[in-house]
Amino acid sequence: STLYGDTAGAFALIKDVYKTDVRALARFVNRHRGREVIPDALINRPPSAELREGQLDEASFPKYAVLDAFLKAYVDGRQSMEDAADRARCDRATAERIVRLIHRNEYKRRQSPTGPKLSGTAFGRDWRYPMTAK
């Protein structure tokens, strides 16, 4: 997340929802309503922090399907990094990078607004990692 960008606000409705699930929910809304309530162009748009022209998240991060599978195993399932990597079908270097990013960005999660807890292990209340740990 971008500090003071998508973390700004008083209430974060999708705080505890994985990126792949957000897209699935948007598609569900459109199917359920029988019309395009959420534009398909928005749903299918490549993820970007939009900090600079042409920036795409998947140029610097694993694909969200891999990232979400890893996080569901590592955070929600409290599995080891190795087991989470197997589940997400990613290599050790990618798994180590994801874990580093999780720990390095703890300070952002501490500053983000409150939101509903939907998973078994939500960042914040159920997941605490020292912000100064190396």
Residue ranges: model-predicted function:
Residues 1-134:
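ATP/NTP-dependent adenylation/nucleotidyl-transfer catalytic domains that generate, transfer
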